[in-house]
């Protein structure tokens, strides 16, 4: 992704650089190929936003493209601070991010627009097999197929963040597709990457 940004930046000007940040830049592939890389605090640290803003100001950065889902809400909530400094963050509004970060709310959003999605089960009305995952999870951490009631461990059943959904067999019945879409500042689709 960084190399794609570098290629596109070179089409506009020789002076545009692509910078990257990470808690541990030496462990980040993006930081290794970026024109410059910087260490920043963890996303859950109080000083995270200030550190990103300071870096952007110090290095005349005018555009920030978040690539980690866990940073989206914090950056969306701080958007006005960045915009006041002439720094644009390519990000959805905080309300939409909140809906997308809580899978229970995402299901409601899909239903509102008649988009089919897996049924969410009440804990006492599970249908097997089902799929268990934290409602606010990321990167499939904690996600698990539950084949039978015997697969329900105490850790799973007592975790208040765990939700249960209809199991969708993406290996044999359905295909999963991910599409990243980028819009301009007027909301026009500029690029769709499957």
Predicted regions located by residue number:
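Hydrophobic anchor at the start of a short beta-strand
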Residues: 18, 117-118, 162
């Amino acid at each position: 992704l960084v190399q794609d940004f570098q290629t596109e930046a070179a089409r506009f000007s020789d002076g545009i650089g692509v910078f990257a940040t990470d808690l541990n830049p030496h462990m980040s592939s993006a930081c290794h190929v970026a024109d410059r890389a910087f260490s920043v605090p963890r996303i859950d640290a109080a000083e995270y936003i200030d550190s990103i803003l300071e870096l952007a100001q110090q290095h005349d950065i005018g555009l920030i493209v978040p690539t980690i889902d866990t940073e989206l809400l914090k950056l969306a909530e701080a958007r006005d601070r960045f915009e006041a400094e002439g720094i644009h963050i390519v990000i959805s509004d905080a309300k939409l991010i909140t809906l997308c970060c809580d899978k229970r709310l995402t299901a409601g959003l899909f239903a509102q627009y008649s988009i089919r999605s897996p049924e969410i089960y009440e804990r006492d009305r599970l249908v097997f097999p089902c799929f268990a995952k934290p409602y606010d999870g990321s990167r499939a951490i904690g996600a698990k197929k539950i084949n039978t009631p015997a697969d329900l461990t105490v850790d799973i059943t007592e975790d208040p963040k765990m939700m249960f959904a209809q199991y969708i067999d993406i290996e044999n019945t359905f295909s999963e597709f991910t599409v990243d879409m980028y819009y301009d500042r007027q909301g026009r689709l500029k690029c769709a990457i499957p």
